[in-house]
């Protein structure tokens, strides 16, 4: 039956394609006749000039149309397709475009008689300007995918019904096309003969365009798919073999699966055509609104036509013949019915009947296909009823003998059966009828229950690279049965978003409450940037609030810093530190070392051999040899030093290299592997134990990193006057210096913090927030937060010299998470230097850490830390979810200074701003007033200082 259906469909496709080609040839013949008639006639000069204007307008519109068309073909189709003959494919597309728009334009010559050449050109220009190219390319993409699958059976659905039943996306385009048709129809009733002539031709071109897009184009593409299938059959052996993989596909180098490695295709942007996820309620409202406009235009068209008809009767008939339609109804002749129908068609305009019928059919289809929300993330996937046969038989008291026989069967031979039922209840495990059905089925191995899918057939489809054709239910069954792994979903379905949805569905079956997964967001995210780069087994993403810090005045430039955090008061406190630094003249920063390290561990049979290896590495010849092998792996890597540290017969070799704008871990690892292969040529008895021997040291606190440095080593310094300290931070330099000594030095030493890890207040807060916002490796927070905070008193004017030293800040501006759109936007927000963006980023991070350290130390000194947290973190939330009663950041710097201030200070006098010769930006002088500062000896306030 299926073969007969395919034959009939193929016959229809050939017939429709041939009909359109014959029609095109006939129209070209008619056009040639018109052109010859035009050239043979005696044309006056004004007529030729009039025709020339139309020709110029048409040429301008045509050139614009060709430009848009070329961009769309290159961007929408040729970039995403996996077919190899792209030049021939490009020629085919342009041929189809020429055929389509030539047939649409020339149709006005046949269906609209007595059309002048100028009106023909102008109507064609209007049609080209208003033509919907999107639906044309969507149909091409839809059937191009079928061609890539080289399977004609999957393209057997017919034209208009195919698009309506397969995807709701086409409904939008069809409604838009019918709306344009109705607008052209209204223009034919404008009572201006010239405009009516133009839009009559345009209306006919639009109707022919609809017929081509939804009848001819699918038929032609299905014939093309059939041809591709035959070509595929001839080359099938070449494509199936492991050596015959085309350039557009690639094999996995190492597959985690126990089966053979399947072909992994490049990503295609076909998610808009297959598995299109929309908001049903929103689209239904848009469709309803569009259809109301469409019907209104039809009614307006009928009214205009009827009014024109009535006015003509008034001029040509007597008063008794004003309504000839009613006269024909009252007549007793049989022919009066035909006159009545003729008059109605004359009033309606027969061209309108075609798209009126299609519009009513489309509206009926929309009403019948109104989307219904499912219970789990708007996915209309039937529930899978799963029963394990062994458990079912063991619980059944009816078949004890069969249960005993089943226990003798090896576990590898037992299969799980998945049944699809119309109801929503799971199968009762104690139902003896289902067990009896299974036992009867097992007696005849050739018979298979109708409700059990052939898992072997589905697995074979995946091996052939046709996994994206499977339904969601079939893929979920393969996952549950162990035939498919969730990590392979992106390669199988070739749609990252659909893979995430399927993985969430599979995970929900293992949860006690499957609706928990609904609270993890996953929509509105480009997973193409994640797959194969940032994360595996993706089930969604985790949104984190991002706060704005700034302006931070760093080396004469102001920066606004994005900070991703869930800790209250952190952004507000850092803003206060930024304000103090801004008023003090800014921060000076410098990068004094830049190197990424990797330290493999090797083994030698004797300590003599290990010492010889160390001597060779320390020699100039050895270093240059290793450097040559190291640097050739990448154009951005540059080996700086090699440090060999022995431990008995083991040697830890620490390679240090510059890596450009990347953080460089993968780059250095690859280069180190190449250097080890080179080293083994000189020491054949060397054995590589591990590419990383923990002397790097990566993602662990280590003193070697603070001494020798890893990543970017940065120092940032600011000089704050006593007035700025008193006004903004409400303290003085002596108190901050004493607090730093007792907290950061003595307290960290008593706690046993290694190296610089404890010599700061909360540097990790800023490091973690900025790493999350800018797409850095979050695990690098461990060693990147090594920070030495120094607050010293300048005895000359009681000012404060604040500095932070960060020897191992491991950051990058390319690769990894910096590819993600949100993280890339945060990097762009920082306005990094074009020449050395990564060094600039490290200096900004160090400056932000300094601002945060100053504010927290001042808050601890003035005992405002708890008050601020109670004020902001324990604030009562407003009942309105769209409003917030408290804000952690403000745009006004004057409000930032009041975060820890419970006093209303009036600004009256001025203070000087600390002079900084390296800072070019000028800071306006501010008014100050005395402010009480807490005394060291008592709780009473000291004598008032002049503060800002």
Swiss-Prot record:
The active site is at residues 567, 699, 777, 869. Glycans are attached at residues 316, 430, 895. It is a multi-pass membrane protein. Its EC number is 1.1.1.34. One of its GO terms (molecular function) is hydroxymethylglutaryl-CoA reductase (NADPH) activity. Keywords: Cholesterol biosynthesis, Cholesterol metabolism, Endoplasmic reticulum, Glycoprotein, Lipid biosynthesis, Lipid metabolism, Membrane, NADP, Oxidoreductase, Peroxisome, Steroid biosynthesis, Steroid metabolism, Sterol biosynthesis, Sterol metabolism, Transmembrane, Transmembrane helix. The chain crosses the membrane at residues 9-25, 55-71, 96-112, 124-140, 207-223, 286-302, 347-363. Residues 467-948 are annotated as: Catalytic. InterPro entries: HMG_CoA_Rdtase, HMG_CoA_Rdtase_cat_sf, HMG_CoA_Rdtase_CS, HMG_CoA_Rdtase_eu_arc, HMG_CoA_Rdtase_N, HMG_CoA_Rdtase_NAD(P)-bd_sf, HMG_CoA_Rdtase_sub-bd_dom_sf. It is found in: Endoplasmic reticulum membrane; Peroxisome membrane. It catalyses: (R)-mevalonate + 2 NADP(+) + CoA = (3S)-3-hydroxy-3-methylglutaryl-CoA + 2 NADPH + 2 H(+). Residues 364-466 are annotated as: Linker. PROSITE patterns: HMG_COA_REDUCTASE_1, HMG_COA_REDUCTASE_2, HMG_COA_REDUCTASE_3, HMG_COA_REDUCTASE_4. SUPFAM superfamilies: NAD-binding domain of HMG-CoA reductase, Substrate-binding domain of HMG-CoA reductase. One of its GO terms (cellular component) is peroxisomal membrane. This transmembrane glycoprotein is involved in the control of cholesterol and nonsterol isoprenoid compounds biosynthesis. It is the rate-limiting enzyme of sterol biosynthesis. NCBIfam families: HMG_CoA_R_NADP. This is 3-hydroxy-3-methylglutaryl-coenzyme A reductase. It comes from Schistosoma mansoni (Blood fluke). The lineage of its organism: Eukaryota, Metazoa, Spiralia, Lophotrochozoa, Platyhelminthes.
């Amino acid at each position: 039956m299926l073969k007969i259906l395919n034959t009939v469909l193929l016959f229809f496709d050939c017939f429709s394609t041939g009909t359109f080609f014959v029609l095109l040839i006939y129209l070209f013949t008619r056009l040639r006749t018109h052109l010859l008639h035009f050239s043979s006639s005696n044309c006056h000069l004004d007529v030729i000039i009039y025709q020339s204007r139309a020709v110029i307008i048409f040429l301008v519109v045509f050139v614009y149309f060709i430009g848009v068309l070329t961009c769309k073909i290159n961007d929408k189709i040729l970039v995403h397709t996996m077919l190899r003959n792209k030049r021939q494919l490009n020629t085919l597309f342009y041929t189809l475009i020429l055929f389509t728009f030539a047939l649409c334009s020339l149709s006005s010559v046949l269906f609209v008689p007595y059309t002048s050449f100028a009106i023909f050109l102008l109507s064609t220009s209007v049609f080209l300007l208003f033509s919907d190219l999107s639906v044309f390319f969507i149909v091409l993409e839809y059937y191009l995918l079928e061609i890539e699958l080289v399977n004609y059976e999957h393209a057997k659905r017919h034209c208009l019904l195919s698009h309506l039943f397969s995807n709701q996306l086409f409904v939008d385009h069809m409604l838009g096309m019918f709306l344009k048709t109705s607008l052209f129809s209204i223009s034919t009733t404008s009572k201006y003969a010239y405009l009516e002539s133009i839009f009559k031709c345009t209306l006919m071109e639009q109707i022919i365009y609809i017929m081509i897009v939804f009848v001819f184009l699918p038929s032609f593409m299905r014939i093309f798919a059939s041809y591709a299938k035959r070509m595929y059959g001839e080359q099938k052996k070449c494509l199936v073999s492991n050596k015959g993989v085309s350039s557009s596909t690639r094999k996995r180098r190492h597959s985690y699966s126990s089966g053979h490695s399947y072909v992994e295709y490049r990503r295609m942007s076909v998610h808009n055509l297959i598995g299109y996820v929309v908001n049903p309620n929103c689209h239904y409202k848009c469709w309803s609104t569009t259809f109301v406009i469409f019907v209104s235009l039809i009614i307006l068209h009928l009214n205009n036509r009827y009014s024109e008809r009535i006015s003509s009767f008034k001029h040509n008939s007597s008063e008794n013949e004003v309504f000839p339609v009613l006269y024909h109804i009252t007549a007793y002749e049989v022919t009066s019915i035909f006159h009545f129908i003729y008059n109605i068609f004359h009033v309606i305009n027969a061209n309108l009947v075609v798209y009126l019928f299609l519009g009513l059919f489309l509206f009926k289809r929309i009403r019948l296909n109104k989307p219904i929300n499912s219970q789990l993330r708007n996915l209309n996937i039937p529930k899978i009823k799963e029963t394990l046969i062994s458990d079912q038989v063991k619980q059944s008291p009816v078949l004890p003998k069969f249960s005993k026989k089943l226990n003798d069967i090896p576990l590898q031979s037992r299969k799980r059966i998945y049944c699809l039922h119309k109801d929503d209840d799971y199968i009762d495990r104690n139902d003896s009828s289902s067990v009896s059905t299974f036992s009867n089925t097992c007696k005849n191995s050739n018979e298979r229950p109708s409700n059990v899918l052939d898992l072997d057939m589905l697995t074979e489809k995946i091996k052939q690279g046709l996994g994206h054709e499977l339904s969601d239910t079939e893929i979920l069954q393969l996952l549950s049965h162990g035939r498919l792994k969730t990590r392979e979903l992106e390669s199988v379905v070739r749609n990252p978003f659909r893979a995430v949805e399927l993985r969430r569905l599979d995970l929900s079956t293992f949860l006690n409450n499957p609706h928990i997964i609904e609270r993890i967001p996953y929509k509105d995210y480009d997973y193409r940037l994640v797959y194969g780069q940032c994360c595996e087994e993706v089930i969604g993403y985790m949104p984190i609030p991002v706060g704005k810090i700034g302006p931070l005045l760093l080396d004469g430039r102001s920066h606004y810093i994005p900070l991703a955090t869930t800790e209250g008061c952190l952004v507000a406190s850092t803003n206060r530190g930024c304000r103090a630094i801004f008023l003090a003249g800014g921060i000076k920063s410098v990068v004094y070392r830049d190197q990424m390290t990797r330290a493999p561990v090797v083994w030698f049979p004797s300590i003599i051999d290990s010492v010889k290896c160390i001597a060779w590495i320390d020699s100039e010849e050895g270093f240059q040899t290793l450097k040559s092998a190291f640097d050739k792996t990448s154009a951005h890597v540059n080996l700086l030093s090699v440090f060999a540290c022995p431990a008995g017969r083991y040697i830890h070799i620490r390679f240090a290299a510059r890596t450009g704008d990347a953080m460089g871990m993968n780059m250095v690892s690859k280069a180190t592997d190449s250097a080890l292969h080179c080293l083994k040529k000189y020491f054949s008895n060397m054995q590589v134990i591990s590419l990383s021997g923990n002397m790097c040291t990566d993602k662990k606190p280590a003193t070697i990193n603070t001494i020798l440095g890893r990543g970017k080593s940065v120092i940032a310094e600011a000089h704050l006057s006593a007035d700025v300290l008193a006004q903004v931070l409400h303290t003085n330099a002596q108190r901050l210096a004493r607090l730093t000594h007792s907290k950061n030095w003595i307290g960290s030493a008593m706690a046993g913090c290694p190296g610089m890890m404890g010599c700061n207040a909360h540097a990790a807060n800023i490091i973690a927030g900025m790493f999350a916002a800018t797409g850095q490796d979050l695990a690098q927070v461990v060693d990147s937060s090594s920070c030495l905070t120094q607050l010293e008193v300048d005895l000359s004017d009681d000012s404060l010299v604040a500095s932070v030293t960060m020897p191992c800040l491991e950051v990058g501006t390319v690769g990894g998470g910096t590819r993600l759109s949100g993280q890339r936007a945060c990097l762009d927000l920082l306005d990094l230097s074009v020449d050395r963006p990564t060094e600039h980023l490290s200096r900004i991070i160090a400056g932000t850490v300094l601002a945060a350290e100053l504010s927290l130390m001042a808050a601890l000194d003035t005992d405002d830390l708890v008050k601020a947290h109670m004020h902001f973190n324990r604030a009562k939330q407003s009942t309105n979810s769209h409003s917030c009663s408290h804000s952690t950041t403000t745009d006004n710097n004057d409000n930032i200074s009041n975060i820890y201030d419970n006093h209303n200070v009036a600004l009256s006098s001025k203070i000087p701003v600390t002079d900084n010769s390296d800072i070019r930006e000028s800071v306006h002088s501010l008014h100050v007033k005395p402010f009480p500062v807490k005394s060291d000896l008592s709780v009473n306030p000291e004598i008032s200082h002049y503060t800002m």
